Regions:
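Short, low-complexity disordered leader/linker segments with a strong preference
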Residues: 1-28, 53, 57, 333-336
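Extracytoplasmic "Venus flytrap"
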Residues: 28-54, 65-74, 170-174, 223-228
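An alpha-beta-alpha
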Residues: 29, 47, 138-188, 284, ...
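Short beta-strand elements in bilobed, periplasmic/extracellular small-molecule ligand-binding domains
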Residues: 54-73, 136-137, 184-200
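Beta-alpha junction/loop-to-helix N-cap segments that form part of ligand/metal-binding clefts
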Residues: 65-128, 223-247
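Hydrophobic alpha-helical segments within soluble ligand-binding/sensing domains
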Residues: 120-162, 262-283
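Pocket-lining segment of extracytoplasmic ligand-binding domains
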Residues: 172-244, 248
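Hinge/cleft segment of the Venus flytrap/periplasmic-binding protein
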Residues: 277-336
Length: 336
């Protein structure tokens, strides 16, 4: 059935491409963000800026309808329903929960979906393969190299013998990297404790618990729930002498010691390029490969490093064998 749908969708997209080629110059794009955090907001800003630039360069107009569901599934479903009712030409889903909801709502409607910052599109069954997604959806992935983050933890502190794993158990983006972290630590013979939270209050309580348990370091993947709480927990962690290693530079911006991962500004630009290719050039999402990125940049918060008694230059030297670049940042609420 899914293969039949893919064939039918390909025909539909081909017909749509013909219509576009006949002179359509205005496209309605519905963008939904999952939650208000530095990384996701940076993605949205770069999608909008790049679409505006591409439109100006090529004589087309993108009418953007931007919404944020603030992690509320009922609001998310209503946003998507409104996009469909308003006859958008394409939807952009920022983060895994939004992409999954959009795919579910649009498969029969034939509306193309481009996702942004989906950590594991295969495990969540958004796509059949990264090379050929197989339906009306494709996009960009911020897949995290968990072993690399683990390597950085032990490069900074070879004697660490208890690691805290802090995440939201309901976040699909955390499932694979947390499993990978456990496997890494098991193989290394290092103990770990799990701490979870589904909102800011619960995350603060989880952080207090890991401080009380005296872990040597904390790992969080690209988890949007923990991201929204980082500004509320980073000072307590630093005061307790516990470094927080994470899967995105926005965590470091908000006070974590380290964020390791993709360049989200570039991810937003590439996402916009894919939107343009589908709408203007008639590219078929079913055979448009998911874009992945080098996530070898380690972003160190120098203020937090100082609070922990760590020297940035020494950290950079220790991290160098395990990443392609080490850069510094200071604490702020959002990227400039």
């Amino acid at each position: 059935m899914k293969k039949l749908f893919a064939v039918m969708l390909a025909v539909l997209m081909t017909l749509s491409a013909c219509a576009f080629a006949e002179g359509q110059t205005t496209y309605k794009v519905g963008i939904c963000n999952y939650v208000d955090d530095a990384s996701l907001n940076q993605i949205v800003a770069n999608i909008q800026d790049q679409l505006a630039a591409l439109g100006e360069e090529n004589g087309v107009t993108f009418e953007i309808d931007y919404k944020n569901c603030n992690a509320d599934s009922s609001v998310l479903n209503q946003i998507i329903a409104n996009f469909i009712a308003n006859d958008v030409d394409l939807m952009v889903g920022v983060a895994t929960p939004v992409a999954m909801a959009m795919q579910s709502a649009t498969e029969d409607a034939g509306i193309p979906v481009v996702f942004a910052a989906v950590s594991d599109p295969l495990a969540t069954e958004l796509v059949e393969s990264l090379e050929a997604p197989g339906a009306n959806i494709t996009g960009t992935s911020d897949y995290l190299d968990t072993a690399a983050v683990m390597n950085l933890i032990f490069a900074a502190d070879p004697e660490a013998d208890m690691i805290g794993l802090l995440y939201d158990i309901g976040q699909d983006a955390s499932t694979t990297p947390i499993a990978a972290a456990k496997a890494y630590l098991d193989e290394k013979g290092v103990a770990y404790k799990e701490y979870t939270g589904t909102n800011v209050t619960e995350v603060i309580m989880a952080a207090d618990a890991l401080i009380a348990d005296g872990v040597d370091a904390v790992f969080t993947p690209t988890d949007n729930t923990i991201m929204t709480a980082e500004l509320s927990i980073y000072e307590a962690l630093a005061e307790a002498g516990i470094p927080h290693y994470t899967g995105a530079d926005s965590f470091a911006l908000n006070g974590a010691l380290l964020g390791y991962g993709v360049d989200y500004a570039n991810l937003g630009v590439v996402t916009a390029d894919m939107v343009y290719d589908i709408l203007v050039n008639g590219a078929d999402p079913a055979v448009t490969p998911v874009r992945t990125f080098d996530n070898g940049t380690a972003t160190v918060n120098t203020e937090t490093a100082e609070a922990l008694g760590l020297d940035f230059e020494a950290l950079s030297a220790a991290f160098a064998p395990f990443c392609t670049r080490v850069q510094s940042i200071v604490t702020a609420e959002s990227f400039d």
